[in-house]
Amino acid sequence: MRKYILTLFMCVIAQFLWAQFKIFTGNPINIVCSQNEECVVWKALELFKRDYRNVFSDSVRVSKSKGNIIVITISDYNPLMKSLQIDFSSLKGKKQAFMIKVLSNNKLLVAGSDRHGTAYGIMELSRMIGVSPWEWWADVIPEKKDAFELPKGYETIQAPSVEFRGIFINDEDWGLMRWSSLNYEPWYKPGRIGPRTNERIFELMLRLRANYYWPAMHECTEPFFLTEGNREMAEKYGIYIGGSHCEPMASSTAVEWHRRGKGEYDYVNNPDGVYKFWEERVKEVAGQDILYTIGMRGIHDGQMKGAKTISEQRKVLERVLTDQRKLLRQYVNSDVTKVPQVFIPYKEVLDIYNSGLQVPEDVTLMWCDDNHGYIRHFPTTEEQSRKGGNGIYYHVSYWGRPHDYLWLGTFSPYLLFQQLKLAYDRGIQKMWILNVGDIKPAEYQIELFLDMAWNIDQVTKKGVSAHLESFLKREFGESIGKTLLPIMNEHYRLAYIRKPEFMGNTRVEEYHNSEYYQTVKDLPWSSAYLKERVDDYNELSDKVQIIYSQIPRNRKDAFFQLVKYPVQGATEMNKKMIYAQFARHGKMNWDKSDAAYDSIVTLTQIYNTGILNNGKWNYMMDFKPRNLSVFDKVKRVSVTEPMKAEQSNIIGKWNASECSSGSFIPCEGLGYEGKAVNIPKGKEINFDFPKVDLDSISVELYFLPSHPVEGEHLRFTITLDGVSTSLIHYETKGYSEEWKENILRNQAYRRIVLPISSALATHRLEVKAVDEGVFLDQLVLAGFK
């Protein structure tokens, strides 16, 4: 036994002897860093000190001359550069890039091309020693280590794929605002998201290599720039402050207009008042890192006042853009093309832009999704060549039509990847901003989004499933992470079919018949599928509960937040609504639906006050944002209409990737069964099936409810046994009824009846894409009478 231990010890020692940089527990380390480094670098060093102490139980000291780790921002004026005799050419000319390189004599170099690059390099060291970016925000307590090593010759050089990468805190009324003002910094008046909270947000952003921030802006929240200490905190962390589509010129209009504006927020009838409102803020923040949103909408996510037609609105916007740039030229930089600006064609503004609005060449055009993950416009060749470049404003949380999804963070990571990769490939590479709601519980989607913005090639090469697995293994260990992967994939798949928030078959903002749309109704599914869905969710929930019992005590809080609450919350919401549907038809006792509701209440109480972190997240989680009817205990009513019957005349049913032949690109994880495909423009896929004794068949096609990639159309044709149809369209417009139905079921639907010969022994049905952006999910052939 002693011989075995000695041999093992010698093997370990030999490994360390070969390593060129090594750290042992119990040994303090010194970091060499110039006092001239900017504040964000020192903030990163503070975080690394904390991380090092948590992992190795020892301290980090900063020195001007001697140390194990050398931290440097390359500059012609930095004396450390000459003494190192290192080739820094790989960093020169790049923004926010860093190099980590093992040197001789057990030293490690962390070099940045600028302040951000150096800070990100330091945070990369934290990741390398095993600290999760979510160590504070999801209570992923770092594991203790005995040692850390890097081999001889180790070097990594990283630079961002997207220049500005950030998050938007939004719809904060029931989560972050209440948590901040009632729990985390309660010594100020309610409604305040102050510098203590924002520092935690900026720490997270630094760990996730984000540099762009849209602060919370609802009427319930004290505006960012009116809260003492917020501006200064952003400067310390090197954060660029921006604003949403209705917050031009760094002004949180929803609240600030009523505080410091005069008259109506109307550039037709009160241009001087609005101009002075903007001027006051620009003068105040002129020396800070601001990405100025330009343009104008209504006070809070509505159309501008004073102009009714598209033509009138375009003329007003042209004047607005001219005057706003005049302010920037006067107070920020006389060369206005050097002031970062962004124009956001959101909702009705896209129609104004498409009518011929001229946006200055140096301004970034920030395109938007439809609030449910499907991008409405991709840059044309001309737009891709603009000096200002292109950006994206994307949602994984939303308040609005056809229904909110603010609660559980079930947005499909596979859809996020597919749409953003397509956006990047089509030139959207300047700015990415993600609407994250309250941050929690969208932790994984945030990390995936920002990882793509940092290194899109690496995420693409790995794939989303491998990225998710790495996330789970990092947070919960190799074995449990591997076990969790299929569970989380199934969790996202079931929510892809219908989000938990959509399970009441209700809608919001239907002003003409609001009572009907707010009333919980039957889902359009058969009894068989309803039972299957409950079984699938129960299986997930049971597996999660078993794993929870195996999680070490120091990671139980993290597991509850990242896995248990979202999976079991979604399970109970589905059970509540499905059991209620059976009860309405007299096929089940109402108590089972009520019990599911009670389980949601209990889970949420645990999240806020009952887990081991002793109320750290109290007021953060609300299972009924906006108090919508879908979140209530279901009212006990009876109905006489029969439930939807199972389709009985099916000839064949396929997921798109199960086609017999053809040209297609698989879409990892997308679709009802995760087997959707992209059919390239001009290509087709084929489905072969045997003889049928019918003279007509019904062809049902289910597509991703996406928007055109080029031009204004999504078209395809069907050919059955050599006979082709005319062009079939399935694009949607605005907030049409078809678009709403598509979003709620997450499929676009087309059905066509075709004649068929009963004399043929086999048949071939071909689906051909006429436009780019055709994503087929499923196909069903049914007998037609």
Model-derived segments and their meaning:
Residues 617-785:
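Extracytoplasmic
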Residues 134-191, 196-216, 388-391:
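An acidic-aromatic substrate-binding cleft motif
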Residues 20-159:
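Contiguous, structured surface segment used for ligand recognition
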Residues 143-148, 225, 233-236, 260-387, ...:
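Gly/Pro-rich turn-and-neighbor structural signature
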Residues 140, 144-145, 468-620, 624:
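C-terminal non-catalytic alpha-helical accessory regions
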Residues 109-112, 175-176, 180-195, 211-221, ...:
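The substrate-binding groove and active-site-proximal loops of carbohydrate-active enzymes
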Residues 1-22:
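Bacterial Sec-dependent N-terminal signal peptides
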